[in-house]
Amino acid sequence: MLYRPAVAAILQNRSGRILICERADAAGAWQFPQGGMEDGETPIAALIREVLEEISLPRNAYSIAWVRGPYRYRFPAGITKKGFRGQAHHYFLLRLRAPKSLVNVGSPNAEFRSARWIWPEEFDLAWLPPMKRRAYRRVLQDFFGATALIQTNSG
């Protein structure tokens, strides 16, 4: 299999802003909570697990509004991870039903160092590695019609 099956969570608060998280291993790199599916795991089960692991939200704190995918991207030439040459994400739009304060990215061994809420059109594609930019552009356009996406660097 070329692409690793994966899920990503676009968490939207009541005002319409979406949650983005800054990677712990790369300052200035922002993304949605995401992760690979384990063997035999369904996309919804993977989503619930990843949201709990990465931002500490239990299943009753959000509703699933929409899912689309897969959106694929390839790793740079010559790179494989866990035997895969890329990832295929199903993106879930989640509506936050609990207070925003429940979102927690500061647990020990956390994948993220911080989080913030932005309007979808404020997402700067330069926050991502080049391999992910096309997929994120499509996701944001498909989910939000965000046509004024920012990109401060070339790519």
Regions found by a protein language model. Give the residues of each.
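Functional cleft and adjacent loop/helix regions within the main domain
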Residues: P33, D39, I79-K81, I150-G155
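Active-site-adjacent beta-strand/loop module that shapes the phosphate/pyrophosphate-binding cleft
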Residues: P70-V103, R116
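The catalytic Nudix box helix
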Residues: F32-R68
